[in-house]
């Protein structure tokens, strides 16, 4: 209970679909009389929910969607975030790989989380050289062509070579990358997000 009122939790599954998420949130606010909503997981869904919260003048607590735009240029006063955002991820990732003589290719999903993550990562690196951004659909399960484009951009580069993966949900590319033995065959390292605490110190 809060202030003598019983809390009721209603779960709704947006299935990672922005249009479905939008209609479910509108229904929660109007039909279920929800005062606050929490979620979603997908940044793409979160972007679709922002104007709904503003229209109904009700709070949307975004967690764990991480695209910067959620509390950046698309933000409104009904939106709150409890977790990290893409820029925080990017800064910590840059700390790990941003060294002179390093060449980087990014591999990301083609939606708000992936694009915001790459944008923030590009802004955070100062010493390494980013030579290509590879974006794949969220529902990708065959990574062969995308990985080949990554290899083609990196294999002949001098110095350390890194593919920075910015991926959330769906089928992640890590098993496909490991199967290609990039380090053994081409000297290409695979890097991805990690703990941000040391980078924030």
Where in this protein do the model-derived segments appear?
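Beta-alpha junction/loop-to-helix N-cap segments that form part of ligand/metal-binding clefts
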Residues: 2-72, 82, 136-141, 170-177, ...
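Extracellular/periplasmic Venus flytrap/periplasmic-binding protein
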Residues: 23, 68-69, 77-185
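Surface-exposed, flexible loop/turn segments at secondary-structure boundaries
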Residues: 17, 45, 68, 87, ...
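Short beta-strand segments enriched in small/hydrophobic residues
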Residues: 1, 40-41, 102-107
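Short active-site oxyanion
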Residues: 34-37, 162-164, 188-191
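Extracellular/periplasmic periplasmic-binding protein-like sensory domains
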Residues: 179-201
């Amino acid at each position: 209970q809060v202030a003598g009122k019983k809390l009721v939790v209603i779960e709704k599954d947006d299935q990672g679909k922005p249009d479905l998420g939008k209609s479910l949130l509108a229904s929660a606010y109007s039909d279920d009389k929800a005062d606050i909503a929490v979620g979603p997981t997908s940044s793409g869904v979160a972007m679709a929910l922002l104007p709904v919260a503003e229209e109904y003048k009700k709070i949307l607590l975004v967690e764990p969607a991480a695209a910067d735009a959620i509390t950046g240029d698309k933000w409104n006063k009904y939106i709150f975030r409890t977790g990290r955002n893409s820029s925080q991820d990017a800064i910590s990732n840059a700390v790990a790989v941003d060294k002179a003589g390093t060449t980087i290719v990014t591999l990301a999903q083609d939606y708000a989380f992936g694009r915001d993550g790459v944008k923030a990562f590009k802004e955070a690196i100062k010493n390494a050289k980013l030579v290509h951004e590879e974006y794949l659909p969220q529902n990708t399960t065959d990574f062969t062509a995308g990985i080949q484009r990554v290899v083609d951009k990196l294999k002949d580069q001098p110095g350390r070579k890194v593919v920075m993966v910015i991926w959330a949900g769906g089928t992640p590319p890590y098993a496909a990358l490991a199967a290609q033995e990039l380090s053994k065959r081409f000297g290409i390292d695979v890097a991805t997000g990690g703990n941000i605490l040391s980078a924030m110190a």
